[in-house]
């Protein structure tokens, strides 16, 4: 059944976390590797040439002077069907993954005083104390939007993207605020304190499908674990 549906789609293999890829491949293709050699090669090529080299590729672009920006969304938990459901996310992808390394409190929590006091510089710390962008791969060009879901793109985020593309901006330069709030209006707001949540965006219908697919992948992971046992 898996091979006739999700496991037969390369796009879904591209979303398998790096740490789970080999186990998932062994579960699905054990004993039929030769029959699916072409498909496996396609997925392996993407993993080795794109997924595993993402940071290397971005660093190379940066060293060549090519400007780019990373915009992450947050203030939601991951889907409540797996062990990492408390991760701060956009409702689908953790902020850590989106931003290439931000340090985050769990959803509904803030970073501890001990952690904050350990920072040499707090300029990359979010005003709501949920995110520390100093650990990002590119802290100077990483921006965060609070209260916006994974696959929704209202006018404010599009306007921000256009503004970033038209400016040689950095966080230290002050052209744009690193942490902003989406409250459903036409403009992003500056986050000024701990309790400023605004009005969270209404959950889109597509989240029903996201929950289904997340549950499906969690089911596959459990199959892998049971096979190991």
Task: Report residues per predicted region.
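Lipid deacylating catalytic domains
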Residues: 1-229
